[in-house]
Swiss-Prot record:
Family: Belongs to the Fmt family.
Short name of any one Pfam family annotated for the protein: Formyl_trans_C
UniProt organism field: Gloeobacter violaceus (strain ATCC 29082 / PCC 7421)
Molecular function GO terms recorded: methionyl-tRNA formyltransferase activity
Alphabetized UniProt keyword annotations: Protein biosynthesis, Transferase
InterPro entries (alphabetical): Fmt, Formyl_trans_C, Formyl_transf_N, Formyl_transf_N_sf, Formyl_transferase-like_C_sf, GART_AS, Met-tRNA-FMT_C, Met-tRNA-FMT_N
Summary of the function given for this chain in its UniProt record: Attaches a formyl group to the free amino group of methionyl-tRNA(fMet). The formyl group appears to play a dual role in the initiator identity of N-formylmethionyl-tRNA by promoting its recognition by IF2 and preventing the misappropriation of this tRNA by the elongation apparatus.
Catalyzed reactions per annotation: L-methionyl-tRNA(fMet) + (6R)-10-formyltetrahydrofolate = N-formyl-L-methionyl-tRNA(fMet) + (6S)-5,6,7,8-tetrahydrofolate + H(+)
Main enzyme class: transferase
GO BP annotations, alphabetical order: conversion of methionyl-tRNA to N-formyl-methionyl-tRNA
Gene3D superfamilies: 3.40.50.12230
Binding site for (6S)-5,6,7,8-tetrahydrofolate: S111, L112, L113, P114
Protein name: Methionyl-tRNA formyltransferase
Amino acid sequence: MRVVYFGTAEFAVPTLEALLAAREIEVVAAVSQPDRPQGRGNRLTPPPVKAIAQSRGIPVFQPDRLRKDLEVLAHLEALQADFFVVAAYGQILPQRVLDMPGRGCINVHGSLLPKYRGAAPVQWAIYHGEPETGITTMLMEAGLDTGPMLKKIAVPIDEDITGEQLLAQLAHLGAGLLLETLREFDRITPEPQDDSLSSYAPLIDKGQYLVDWGQSARQIRNQIRAFYPYTHTFHRGSRLRLLAAELTSTGSEQFQPSAIIHVIKSKGFEVVTGDGALLLTRVQPAGGKEQPAWDYANGCRLMPGESLGL
């Protein structure tokens, strides 16, 4: 079975490794996004999928825009693959590419389709307080994550799990599900998606990391978990990342949202929200290290009555 693998992000690595370990599958090429500057030094860094593929001697193509790169398109066509497999690639495949493999294009998607079609399904599922999510393998078509579904696995969303942790969990489940899908492909009846049940999970905009203290305590906690480690507020003019929080029953009717009402020894500090209060337990100040919120409060002599967001 000849497979071309399309993937870029860390989420795509377990599926590639599973394909490489399967004796009946030959990964004949990988397609990934171009190297990008990363880190404080803006060093040009290869995507995780490229690094794995190159270490195994697999040809890697990195077109800026796949649909416009005629040379790469010609190479892909010449490979005569049975399947194209896609996981967290980052570009929409044009119809010409979808038509190339002999048996089809299969996508590994991090949600229970048709819910959360789009680029960030895991984070938005946590943000919206979903009790479960999962992995779907699907046949690809021109629409965004609209193709017929092949197999699914449902996973409960733990109350404390972050988007980063859930992505890693789903990535490994997706690898196994993809192998099952390929091996059982001829016996699977594709299931059309019900568009009336669909929802969209767009790319995360940096503005969505900023906390609005007028929201409910649960919603802010979901935001902290979903977008970990980037959710933040401001304190004394500097950004303060919020890394973990607990719901609390503390009343706060006499205070406005964003006010700090209690500093609790060895725990953290409570902040007024739109419907009560939230106990912050781990934070990271600008230019500093992740630390217990109590250590931060103690170090900067945090006082009840101060406000965050300023």
